[in-house]
Amino acid sequence: GWGLWEEVNLIIKGGNYGWATMQGVQCSSSERHTATAGCDQVDMIAPAFAYGHSDGRGASVTGGYVYRGKQLRGLLGAYLYADFPSNRVSALRYEDEAVQSDDVIASVPMPASFGEDESGEVYIVSFSGFIYALEALPGE
């Protein structure tokens, strides 16, 4: 992503993800806020997931981890990521080359980075100076 879109990619060594010809799923010019009508997308790998800045989801994706912990079994195998301006933390499920679900699971002020402990539990670092642990709500 850049000025119009945010994206999540499945990384393949040597893969061409279209930077700076593409923003998300849209062709773009060298001006970061300008879309173009078309571009050469030969050999480019499309994002696994993308969202536009104009759809209200946010404007700055913060990459995370695939959840492999034991405390939040409902998230097992989901890719956890955040969006900085919206404070949303989401769980993205991608299977059979398609997004199966993308659910907001938490809100963290100014998410800056993710971390993972030796048990696979995920933590979120905030620009507010705190580290947040993801925990199940009572009864879940």
Predicted regions and their residues:
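Blade-level signature of beta-propeller repeat domains, shared across WD40, Kelch, NHL, RCC1
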Residues: 113-140
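Beta-propeller domain segments
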Residues: 1-100, 134-137
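Weak global preference for isoleucine
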Residues: 11-12, 45, 105-108, 124, ...
